[in-house]
Amino acid sequence: MEQTWRWYGPNDPVSLADVRQAGATGVVTALHHIPNGEVWSVEEILKRKAIVEDAGLVWSVVESVPIHEDIKTHTGNYEQWIANYQQTLRNLVQCGIRTVCYNFMPVLDWTRTDLEYVLPDGSKALRFDQIEFAAFEMHILKRPGAEADYTEEEIAQAAERFATMSDEDKARLTRNIIAGLPGAEEGYTLDQFRKHLELYKDIDKAKLRENFAVFLKAIIPVAEEVGVRMAVHPDDPPRPILGLPRIVSTIEDMQWMVDTVNSMANGFTMCTGSYGVRADNDLVDMIKQFGPRIYFTHLRSTMREDNPKTFHEAAHLNGDVDMYEVVKAIVEEEHRRKAEGKEDLIPMRPDHGHQMLDDLKKKTNPGYSAIGRLKGLAEVRGVELAIQRAFFSR
């Protein structure tokens, strides 16, 4: 695997010098300063590429070229936003960048309720608490009909939890959910958030798939023409939330994408932490079935709790993800490609490290502190080395 590292640009507290010292050779980044939907110019792409290369690294993957909300709702100026997206892909290829991670999650990208969940060893992790989320949705957001998405027990527990929250607790929970986590391209006030949810009131899973198909049928032929590998990131969490449909959550969703546009440019980001939240997702089977279309991997693990919809970010080699079997399946796919004469490695980045050691005293991007990811990268690197030596060194 190609060892990469997500970097949020010049304002990231983790420097490119840090990235290189961690042992990564590739950088995963994006032009976050360009508004959603606008074309990434060759000039702006080359500026970022030069910064990365001056640090002795390469820009391996774009994460992400965000998709404008008008495309997801099939409203407004969606045709122009699609044309802009097509041009951005052409410009990236002109600059030598050919792997693009993206997602089709409506309104919110990845979602957590607690950004400082303290683990038994004193380090901090990200957590999604189903009951806290229900308390937010029913008692703070007050989304009409939200009760239908929860069990009677969850509704009662959410009411109890809300009753014990201070004003600061409520503000923090709201901020964590709607203000935008690292990599998210949108942040909202509560009123703005309600208005954006309203835009989806008539969009169910079938309609969102229909809108996604319009995007794929416009974008994938351009990607195929210019040589871009599109790698969709799964929903996080991989299930409907806030009354919004989610359509990249299961192996069935992956198959739907392939059936909709059967091009090798139409590929996947294997995010083990996102897919792995669902106990019914067999990660190794996903890799084996769709291996030739996996162009990027996010390796992390999560741990489901007593309520199976509550989870926290586990250490990379712990939790519900069998990281050994996952890495073995990825390495096997790389060797299959090599046997076909393809030498390209699959870019991998350690995802969502714990905040630990000296980083506990620093301001960090939630999930993206340096030391926790350094630990994760070293652990995954060791797993891969052992697999390569044991099975492929002859």
UniProtKB/Swiss-Prot annotation:
Highest taxon, organism lineage: Bacteria
GO molecular function, one term: mannonate dehydratase activity
Keywords from the named record: Iron, Lyase, Manganese
SUPFAM superfamilies hit by this protein: Xylose isomerase-like
Pathway: Carbohydrate metabolism; pentose and glucuronate interconversion
InterPro entries per record: Man_deHydtase, Xyl_isomerase-like_sf
Cofactor(s) the protein requires to work: Fe(2+); Mn(2+)
Catalytic activity: D-mannonate = 2-dehydro-3-deoxy-D-gluconate + H2O
Annotated EC: 4.2.1.8
Coiled coil (UniProt feature): none
Pfam families reported for this sequence: UxuA
GO biological process annotation, one example: D-glucuronate catabolic process
Homology family: Belongs to the mannonate dehydratase family.
Function, as annotated: Catalyzes the dehydration of D-mannonate.
Protein name (database record): Mannonate dehydratase
